[in-house]
């Protein structure tokens, strides 16, 4: 079974696309709601039961960056205390940037401005008196990013400083350089910086020490 999420939910031609997928591949793609999508994502994270339960004993933010939106969920001592969906998907951000012809450095600044503006209210409402130690990143782009984060062996996390160094390097790359370094096509290469920006800016505003 295949699922489609935010980008397909909001597409005006979603029925045509789904029909074409069915005709060409035989796959029946089901468009699921935001709550269904998050349930599946969190179920996957929680499948590592021992490690997950240990992590969320301390303040933890789970950040799920999709193509159309991003979901931030805060956990504290095993309990979900807040969750918010925001229009910070990598494809949505890339679409906004495409309207503004800027340099490589300018891309980073514009993305961060968009992300920060969306996070202002969330920070005021949910982070004022809350300590976040861990940030768990999930989503469409996370595997490509984690492969280049220098994680070795059976480890599944890096500290905040390592994440920032990685983000700085990524933000200085051209699309061609990202294609070559990450082994992706140009369409996907365009999405990696927006996704990394969302993870890194949320890492900053929460003050989390570790990125999982």
Q: Where are the predicted features?
A:
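Helical "lid/coupling" subdomains associated with nucleotide-phosphate turnover
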Residues: 1-2, 7-59, 74-212
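Active-site-adjacent helix-turn-beta-strand microarchitecture at beta-sheet edges
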Residues: 66-69
């Amino acid at each position: 079974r295949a699922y489609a999420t935010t980008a397909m939910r909001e597409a005006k031609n979603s029925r045509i696309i789904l029909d074409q997928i069915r005709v060409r591949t035989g796959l029946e793609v089901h468009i699921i709601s935001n709550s269904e999508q998050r349930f599946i994502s969190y179920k996957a994270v929680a499948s590592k039961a021992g490690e997950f339960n240990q992590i969320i004993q301390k303040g933890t933010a789970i950040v799920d960056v999709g193509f159309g939106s991003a979901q931030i969920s805060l956990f504290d001592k095993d309990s979900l205390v807040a969750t918010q969906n925001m229009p910070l998907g990598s494809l949505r951000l890339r679409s906004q940037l495409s309207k503004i012809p800027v340099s490589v450095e300018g891309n980073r600044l514009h993305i961060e401005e968009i992300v920060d503006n969306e996070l202002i209210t969330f920070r005021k409402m949910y982070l004022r008196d809350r300590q976040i130690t861990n940030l768990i990143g999930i989503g469409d782009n996370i595997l490509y990013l984690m492969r280049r984060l220098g994680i070795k062996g059976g480890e599944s996390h890096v500290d905040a400083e390592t994440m920032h160094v990685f983000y700085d390097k990524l933000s200085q790359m051209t699309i061609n350089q990202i294609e070559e370094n990450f082994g992706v096509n140009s369409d996907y290469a365009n999405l990696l910086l927006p996704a990394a920006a969302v993870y890194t800016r949320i890492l900053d505003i929460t003050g989390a020490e570790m990125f999982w």
